[in-house]
């Protein structure tokens, strides 16, 4: 996927594409030093990372003012959603090197974020509208970690892969919840789960 195809698909302005191009440049630079993403995914970053993240925008609750992204790593999807206009994005990343990358990527793209360099269980609870995660943990572990936010009324929007059915079965043995499932636009084997109304089973 080219930047032009991405811009037509999402769609976004030329200025936003330029910010994402700057993001990609700093990602490729840092990737030589620390493992931020799977190496082969950089063969098609506009599909594998930027579209993968941007497709969540249409699935966020309306309005979404505060977003909490778990295990942000290289910034997908949280930093992309901040670039695309979510007003207040909190990134949680325990790894200090990855946190340093996120600070630099936010600086280069002129994007306001709130970074929490700590483990999720150490994060104080505050009001959020939606919790996101990609490649962070199995669904049951995500729900357990994010429970203080989800039980307070936040929705969850999570990118998942081929193991989605097994992960849902495990999670639903511990939680009752509403689940909506969407096919990924960036990965034929991927899925997006939108979860709400969560209670312990």
UniProtKB/Swiss-Prot annotation:
Primary location recorded for the protein, binned into one broad class: cytoplasm
Q: Is RNA-binding given among the entry's keywords?
A: no
**What does the record give as EC number?**
2.1.1.170
Q: Which Pfam families match?
A: GidB
What enzyme class is recorded for this protein?
Answer: transferase
Q: What SUPFAM superfamilies is this protein classified in?
A: S-adenosyl-L-methionine-dependent methyltransferases
Keyword Transferase appears in the UniProt entry: yes
UniProt binding sites for S-adenosyl-L-methionine: 71, 76, 120-121, 134
Q: Reaction catalysed?
A: guanosine(527) in 16S rRNA + S-adenosyl-L-methionine = N(7)-methylguanosine(527) in 16S rRNA + S-adenosyl-L-homocysteine
**Alphabetical keyword list:** Cytoplasm, Methyltransferase, rRNA processing, S-adenosyl-L-methionine, Transferase
Gene Ontology cellular-component terms for this entry are: cytosol
What does the UniProt entry say about where the protein is found? Cytoplasm
Q: Which GO terms describe its molecular function?
A: rRNA (guanine-N7-)-methyltransferase activity
Q: Give the InterPro entries listed for this entry.
A: rRNA_ssu_MeTfrase_G (IPR003682), SAM-dependent_MTases_sf (IPR029063)
NCBIfam families xrefs: rsmG_gidB
> What task does this protein carry out?
Specifically methylates the N7 position of guanine in position 527 of 16S rRNA.
Instruction: Please report which protein family the annotation says this sequence is part of.
Output: Belongs to the methyltransferase superfamily. RNA methyltransferase RsmG family.
Protein name, as recorded: Ribosomal RNA small subunit methyltransferase G
Q: Which species?
A: Rhodospirillum rubrum (strain ATCC 11170 / ATH 1.1.1 / DSM 467 / LMG 4362 / NCIMB 8255 / S1)
Its gene name is rsmG
């Amino acid at each position: 996927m080219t930047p032009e195809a991405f811009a037509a698909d999402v769609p976004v302005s030329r200025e936003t594409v330029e910010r994402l191009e700057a993001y990609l440049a700093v990602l490729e630079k840092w990737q030589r030093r620390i493992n931020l993403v799977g190496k082969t995914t950089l063969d098609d970053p506009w599909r594998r990372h930027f579209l993968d993240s941007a497709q969540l925008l249409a699935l966020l609750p309306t309005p979404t003012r505060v977003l909490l992204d778990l295990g942000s790593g290289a910034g997908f999807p949280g930093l992309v959603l901040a670039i695309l206009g979510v007003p207040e994005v909190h990134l949680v990343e325990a790894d200090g090197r990855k946190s340093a990358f996120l600070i630099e990527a936010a600086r280069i793209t002129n994007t306001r974020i709130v970074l929490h360099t700590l483990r999720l269980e150490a994060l104080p609870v505050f009001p959020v509208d939606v919790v996101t995660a990609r490649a962070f943990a199995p669904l049951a572990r995500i729900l357990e970690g994010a429970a203080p936010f989800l039980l307070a009324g936040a929705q969850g929007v999570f990118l998942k892969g081929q193991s989605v059915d097994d992960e849902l079965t495990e999670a639903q043995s511990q939680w009752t919840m509403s689940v909506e499932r969407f096919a990924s636009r960036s990965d034929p084997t991927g899925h997006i789960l939108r979860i709400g109304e969560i209670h312990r089973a």
